[in-house]
């Protein structure tokens, strides 16, 4: 097996001059490797090593500097000192005692000191680093938050997909004893209920519902159509079930301007208009319930349709549609005579009357000369003679 460079190793000169014994590495090296397992003579063989003369030697093709000079004699190191080796050895061919082909030489005693228990170990990483003091590590990297159990990290069932088409293995959350905290009820406030129009005098008996905190309350629009239950409550004087057991006083409807022609007969027969207005003094009847709902907004003042541009409210959806055209500039109605465009159909109809009047005037002016050009019969004067 051949060695590759993993790191530069600080080695003393004496270790290069004194050859290691041949039986130091047997053919099958056990897992617990001891570099100095010889007799006392072999240990004394290294007592003359000088620990001060150290140089970096790599296992590559780099040649050392030939100009360096070395002394012929080596003085023994004062005291009982040790030399520490730090590095790794990588091998091309794998062996049964080193599966990862990497040997990490952490430390080895030289002068009769027994090596540490972790002197020689195999690691799966490709580089070794000297660990800094524990205080510096804690200062640079704060400690991670402790976890009581695995359920804090994995609270949902984990499933693994098999590419061969087998069904995934699902692990139930019973293995991870954890319970999710319940959602705070204050996190999502209740949305206001617009199922029924409330009179200003009755707002005190209804619990207050606040919209979302980040949303403007004026932009929360009620539904466009008043529910049919509200109309029946007006008509039959019944208590709406949404109010519970609290009695609701009858809703007073605001009077409206009287009709210009109150006794004008309607084209639709009376029996085909079963929906009558419940307001006092109003004799309006309608054939459809939605027409009555739209009419009741006149009495209640309810304007559920709101423009999101200028925040103006309307009681009818078609009024909102024509109002939005003032912001967009859309004019879909064009005059048939002059091509002028209008945003509302009634404006075009009013404008068309101008052309009709002009046409009538032209026809009148064209008919007057034809009447004057008719031939007139002139009678001859009667001549009388006197005798």
Swiss-Prot record:
Biased composition (Basic and acidic residues): 269-283
Entry's localization field: Nucleus
Chief subcellular location: nucleus
InterPro entries in the record: EGR_N, Znf_C2H2_sf, Znf_C2H2_type
Compositional bias annotation for Basic residues: 350-360
Disordered: annotated segments: 241-283, 348-387
CC annotations in GO: nucleoplasm; synapse
Record-level GO BP terms: cell migration involved in sprouting angiogenesis; cellular response to fibroblast growth factor stimulus; cellular response to vascular endothelial growth factor stimulus; endothelial cell chemotaxis; negative regulation of apoptotic process; neuromuscular synaptic transmission; peripheral nervous system development; positive regulation of endothelial cell proliferation
GO molecular-function terms, A-Z: DNA-binding transcription activator activity, RNA polymerase II-specific; DNA-binding transcription factor activity, RNA polymerase II-specific; RNA polymerase II cis-regulatory region sequence-specific DNA binding; sequence-specific DNA binding; sequence-specific double-stranded DNA binding; zinc ion binding
UniProtKB keywords: DNA-binding, Metal-binding, Nucleus, Repeat, Transcription, Transcription regulation, Zinc, Zinc-finger
SUPFAM superfamilies, A to Z: beta-beta-alpha zinc fingers
Pfam family, one: zf-C2H2
Zinc finger annotations (C2H2-type) as residue ranges: 275-299, 305-327, 333-355
Gene3D superfamilies attached to this UniProt entry: Classic Zinc Finger (3.30.160.60)
Biological function: Probable transcription factor involved in muscle spindle development.
PANTHER family associated with the record: EARLY GROWTH RESPONSE PROTEIN 3, KRUEPPEL-LIKE TRANSCRIPTION FACTOR
Family under the similarity heading: Belongs to the EGR C2H2-type zinc-finger protein family.
Stated name of the protein: Early growth response protein 3
Organism of provenance: Rattus norvegicus
Lineage: Eukaryota, Metazoa, Chordata, Craniata, Vertebrata
Gene (UniProt): Egr3
């Amino acid at each position: 097996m051949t060695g590759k460079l993993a790191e530069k190793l600080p080695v003393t000169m004496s270790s290069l001059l004194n050859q290691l014994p041949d039986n130091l590495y047997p053919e099958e090296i056990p897992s617990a490797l001891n570099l100095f397992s010889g007799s006392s003579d072999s240990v004394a063989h290294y007592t003359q090593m000088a620990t001060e003369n150290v140089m970096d030697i790599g296992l590559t093709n780099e040649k050392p500097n030939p100009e360096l000079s070395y002394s012929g004699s080596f003085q023994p190191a004062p005291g009982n000192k040790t030399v520490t080796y730090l590095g790794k050895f990588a091998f091309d061919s794998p062996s049964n005692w080193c599966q990862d082909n990497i040997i990490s030489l952490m430390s080895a005693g030289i002068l009769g000191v027994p090596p540490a228990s972790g002197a020689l170990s195999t690691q799966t990483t490709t580089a070794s680093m000297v660990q800094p003091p524990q205080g510096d590590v804690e200062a640079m990297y704060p400690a991670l938050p402790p976890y009581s159990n695995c359920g804090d990290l994995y609270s949902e069932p984990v499933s693994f997909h098999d590419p061969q088409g087998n069904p995934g293995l699902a692990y139930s959350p019973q293995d991870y004893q954890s319970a999710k905290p319940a959602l705070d009820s204050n996190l999502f406030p209740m949305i206001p209920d617009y199922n029924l129009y409330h009179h200003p005098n009755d707002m005190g008996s209804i619990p207050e519902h606040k919209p979302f905190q980040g949303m403007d309350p004026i932009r929360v629009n009620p539904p466009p159509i008043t529910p049919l239950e509200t109309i029946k409550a007006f008509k039959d004087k019944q208590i709406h079930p949404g109010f519970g057991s609290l009695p609701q006083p009858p809703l007073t409807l605001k009077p409206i301007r009287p009709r210009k022609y109150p006794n004008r007969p309607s084209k639709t027969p009376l029996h085909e208009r079963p929906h009558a207005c419940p307001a006092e003094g109003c004799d309006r009847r309608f054939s459809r319930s939605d027409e009555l709902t739209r009419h009741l907004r006149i009495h209640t003042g309810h304007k559920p349709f709101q423009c999101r541009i200028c925040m103006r409210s309307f009681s009818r959806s078609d009024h909102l549609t024509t109002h939005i055209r003032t912001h967009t500039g859309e004019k879909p109605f064009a005059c048939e005579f002059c091509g002028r465009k209008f945003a509302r159909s009634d404006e075009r109809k009013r404008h068309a009357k101008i052309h009709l009047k002009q046409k009538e005037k032209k026809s009148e002016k064209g008919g007057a000369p034809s009447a004057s050009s008719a031939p007139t019969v002139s009678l001859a004067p009667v001549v009388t003679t006197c005798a």
